[in-house]
Amino acid sequence: MNLRSKVDSQPAYVLHSYPFRETSLIVEVFSRDFGRMALLARGARRPRSAIRGLLMAFQPLEIAWAGKGEVLTLMKAEWQGGLPLLAGEALFCGYYLNELLMHLLPREDAHEQLFASYAKMLALLAADPSGKVREADLRCFEKALLQELGYGLTLNHDSDANLIEPDTFYTYRIEQGPVRIDHGEGATQVVRGKTLLDLDAEDFSDPRTRHEAKALMRMLMAYYLAGKELETRKIFKELQEL
């Protein structure tokens, strides 16, 4: 339970919002110093509400709240400007990031470094007018997210404490990290040592590294999401089938 009666001038981003009663919203925000918070925006759905147009995803805000309990009351929201609206692939990617944070971040658990990584990622997504997304940027954010949650990847040594060898094949096991295998041994998820080292160095110049790193991250996210299917991924699949 949140015991802080009032917080002012807190940098934050909207992750998700949904209607509450006739004229209000429950807004899930990611704040710099308090982590994920649930706030009641009273009257935000009224046509003349001063904050109705401000509570948008992917835009930097400065907010204030007051109250006690799990859902606090939003007192103020000011747009900090500077980011174009996301479009195309970047918009889907932004919603993907928000879903990850909604599902994986516990409430009221501060992650200042992750907040900075999220803000940087949004700036990168907004920087390309075509809405294209660099896979390298997405992999770096996913890696930072897991690190912040205490699920940091082991990428430079294997389960036997041996240094990762670029030309050796491994399978990645959640509780053990990279486990050396003979290529073709039948593991469901196989990754080159070079890919692990590239991911550690955040070097995605090799196309095969990008492909294998994507598969590895997808497996890890599925595990930590504990079976929850992300809406963004489902919608993207449906669009590809049209």
From Swiss-Prot:
GO annotation, biological process: DNA recombination; double-strand break repair
Listed InterPro entries: ARFGAP/RecO (IPR037278), DNA_rep/recomb_RecO_N (IPR022572), NA-bd_OB-fold (IPR012340), RecO (IPR003717), RecO_C (IPR042242)
TM stretches of this protein: none
GO cellular component: bacterial nucleoid
Pfam families documented for this protein: RecO_C, RecO_N
UniProt keyword list: DNA damage, DNA recombination, DNA repair
Listed HAMAP family: RecO
Function as written in the Swiss-Prot or TrEMBL entry: Involved in DNA repair and RecF pathway recombination.
The family this protein is said to belong to: Belongs to the RecO family.
NCBIfam families: reco
Protein name per Swiss-Prot or TrEMBL: DNA repair protein RecO
